A protein has these predicted regions:
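Extracytoplasmic catalytic/substrate-binding loops of multi-pass membrane glycan-assembly enzymes
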Residues: 25-39, 47-71, 77-90
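Juxtamembrane membrane-water interface segments immediately following transmembrane helices
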Residues: 26-52, 228-339, 357
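Loop-to-helix entry region of an early transmembrane alpha helix in multi-pass inner-membrane enzymes
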Residues: 76-113, 147
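Membrane-interface anchor segments at the N-terminal boundary of transmembrane helices
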Residues: 93-107, 359-468
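Transmembrane-helix motifs of polytopic, lipid-linked glycan transferases
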Residues: 101-126, 140, 159, 163
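Short acidic/glycine- and proline-prone juxtamembrane loop motifs at membrane-interface regions
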Residues: 146-156
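Membrane-interface transmembrane helices that cradle and orient dolichyl/undecaprenyl
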Residues: 164-180, 211-215
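Membrane-interface alpha helices of multi-pass inner-membrane proteins
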Residues: 179-194, 231-236
């Protein structure tokens, strides 16, 4: 079969990655899109070398409740250091010469191109349709198309990370012009956001070490790592030069909000340290931190019943006089909050090192599994309400914004919770299949014998996939620990996981027929370890046989939980009351577990026959007693647990309820429903 011409394949992939915008009728924007646009215009004016006297049109405001004059140029230099002018140039250029449809097309094309290079270098003999099929699955089954058409720099987290992987693992299969283009993508991704800079730089060093371990020559590793590091240096230098020019022209120094301060305060150790430090010096002498002036507000914010990442948002951005810190501070106080940030964070770590470490690891873990699309699903009408946002660039950036102006409504045609369920299924299946394929003999042995020395395809593919997964892990660490476990930070690049599976499927035979034997081998390994544990004199007496009825009953209970939770979340997403939804999901799970228990768990309990109706009635009665305990615990958890993520709330409630009813259900099933000598006809 002849290959589709690369340009035609890229154009088709670009259109597929814009599918969400086509369905919505417009690309999406965010509050920060305005700030990026303002900074982009300032960079353009800097290049044009406009006289400094023209810069009195930059009306500086100190807090969102105090705007001097409505203007689309409102900005505060103490916050705009976190908004890159280099992405702003791209955004404003799209606005000037096309619309943000042009920006969406460019971002989609760049994503399609980087994925194409991954596919071509990892699977050089694969048919062209496999590339388009992979893109199509990603477009409808992952978050990628929500971020390629989002007027924010988030998509470059994934594009930049993938570009680093290409340079490190596939550099010998790339043309010089392609390497130059990937280097430019890396540098651009780094200069537009500090989290991209940190993630890509960490990936360069960690990836270089991994590639050296699996056989790549030291010279090749050093050359490729240096190439990525040079992009990081150029990105840092470009940002520093602009900051200095900006200060010279305007008299203001670009700063950034104290994100890490807000993070350690929201996590808990920071607040405890703040109270101790401020109390010790309040008795005599100056207070050690500007933050001490706001410690009452911090205390009020941390007591608000919202998730941790939202607490840090309250500390930074709330306008309420009893909650906010940064947004209520004067300009000198904002400068002070920024300058004392590292000193405060170091003081917090010294004050409670274990608490800070534990909170950071928890934030990392939360970020790692935060895959839900949220900000790109905002209703554009939100940017057209009030007296401030309609004066910014946002109405001009939103295509056909008149249709969204209140009382109009142009919310995206996607249910966020249904979308989260769908993306979650795709991610779980992708992860399981990826782990299975990477653990097979060809990849495992090729990596073990340092197959990159001889250019073995399984080693090359395995190393590339490990690096792509490494992008996800490092991004979660950087964003979760330094800013907070916000869903957008991870969902913007979680699509790398299904893409990795698509690349593996294109490059290596999937051998689906070998999946069942592989599962059996893993089960045999677990069984062997379990029996060894049972042979130990101390713990063995507490462990039932792995193949016994209780363990099989637990496996069926796991299946029942999946059915229960799957039905529960689906119908809750459709608007059904949580209590009524649980009754329905329980009923479906009872039927499913009864069928599996009778044909597998208790299949050896045979005897005089009785009707299926009587057997099911007995099973339902036992399950109802277990469900009473299950339901009581579930209700207590969803209404009393300090968890504000609805899916996590449902998950914890279902897990706790299932555990509570397990023993009752097992004893009843064994001794009443499937007791020896009783079998249904």
């Amino acid at each position: 079969m002849r290959r589709i011409p690369p340009l035609l394949a890229l154009l088709a992939a670009t259109l597929l990655l814009m599918s969400v915008a086509f369905a919505d009728g417009r690309p999406t924007v965010f509050y920060d899109s305005h700030s990026y646009d303002v900074m982009g215009r300032d960079l353009i004016e800097t290049v044009q070398d406009w006289p400094a006297s023209n810069h009195n049109k930059y009306e500086r405001h100190l807090k969102m409740s105090d705007w001097p004059v409505p203007s689309d140029r409102l900005t505060d230099p103490q916050t705009e250091g976190a908004r890159s002018p280099f992405y702003g140039v791209l955004l404003h250029g799209a606005y000037l010469f096309t619309t943000i449809w042009g920006l969406a097309a460019l971002q989609s094309f760049l994503a399609a191109w980087v994925i194409y290079l991954l596919w071509r270098t990892m699977a050089p003999r694969a048919p062209s349709w496999s590339y388009l099929a992979m893109i199509a699955v990603a477009a409808v089954g992952t978050s990628i198309s929500f971020y390629t058409t989002f007027a924010m720099p988030d998509i470059f987290a994934g594009i930049g990370g993938a570009a680093v992987v290409l340079i490190l693992a596939q550099g010998d299969r790339l043309k010089k012009l392609e390497i130059a283009g990937l280097w430019a993508v890396c540098a651009y991704a780094m200069v537009i956001h500090k989290s991209h800079w940190a993630t890509e730089l960490l990936l360069a060093f960690a990836g270089g070490l991994l590639l050296w371990i699996v056989g790549l020559s030291t010279q090749s590793v050093v050359r490729r790592v240096v190439l990525v590091v040079s992009a990081a240096v150029v990105a840092w230098a470009a940002g520093a030069v602009f900051d200095q020019i900006y200060q010279n022209r305007t008299g203001y120094r670009l700063g950034h909000p104290p994100f890490i301060t807000a993070r350690v305060l929201a996590d808990g150790p920071g607040e405890a340290y703040m109270r101790q430090a401020c109390a010790q010096t309040a008795q005599g002498g100056a207070q050690p931190y500007v933050l001490c002036k706001f410690q009452t507000n911090v205390g009020h914010s941390t007591k608000v019943k919202v998730s941790g990442e939202l607490i840090s948002n309250l500390i930074l951005w709330s306008d309420k006089k009893t909650l906010g810190v940064f947004n209520l501070a004067s300009r000198p106080q904002r400068v002070g909050l920024e300058s004392e940030e590292m000193r405060f964070v170091v003081g917090t770590v010294k004050f409670d090192p274990l608490g800070t470490l534990g909170a950071s690891l928890w934030d990392w873990g939360q970020e790692l599994v935060a895959y839900q699309v949220d900000d790109p699903l905002r209703n554009p009408s939100a940017y057209l309400r009030g007296h401030y946002w309609p004066t910014t660039m946002l109405p001009k950036l939103i295509p056909n914004f008149q249709a969204c102006r209140p009382p109009g409504d142009c919310r995206p045609p996607f249910n966020d919770m249904v979308l989260a369920d769908w993306h979650g299924v795709v991610l779980v299946v992708s992860l399981l299949l990826l782990v299975w394929r990477m653990s097979l003999k060809d990849v495992r042995q090729s990596l073990w014998r340092r197959g990159l020395k001889t250019g073995e395809d399984p080693a090359r593919v395995g190393a590339s996939v490990l690096l792509l997964v490494g992008v996800l892990v490092l991004n979660a660490a950087v964003c979760g620990i330094l800013s907070g476990p916000f869903a957008r930070y991870q969902s913007r690049l979680i699509w790398l996981l299904p893409i990795s599976l698509g690349l593996v499927a294109s490059a290596l035979p999937m051998r689906i027929k070998g999946l069942a034997p592989w599962i059996k081998r893993r089960w045999d390994g677990v069984s062997d370890l379990w029996e060894r544990a049972r042979a130990q004199p101390v713990i063995g007496r507490f462990l039932p046989p792995l193949g016994g009825h209780f363990m099989r009953f637990c496996c069926v209970g796991g299946l029942g939980f999946i059915v229960d939770f799957g039905v529960l979340t689906t119908i809750v997403d459709l608007g059904v009351n949580k209590i009524a939804a649980r009754l329905l999901s329980f009923s479906v799970a009872v039927v499913a577990t009864w069928l599996v228990n009778r044909v597998w768990t208790f299949r050896d309990y045979d005897g005089p026959k009785r009707s299926l109706a009587r057997e099911f009635g007995s099973y339902l009665s036992v399950q109802s007693v277990g469900f009473a305990a299950n339901f009581a615990v579930y209700t207590a958890v969803i209404y009393a647990a300090p968890v504000h993520n609805e899916h996590l709330q449902l998950l914890l409630g279902s897990l706790a309820g299932t555990a509570a009813g397990l023993v009752i259900n097992y004893l009843g099933a064994k001794h009443l429903v499937f007791r020896r000598g009783v079998r249904a006809s």
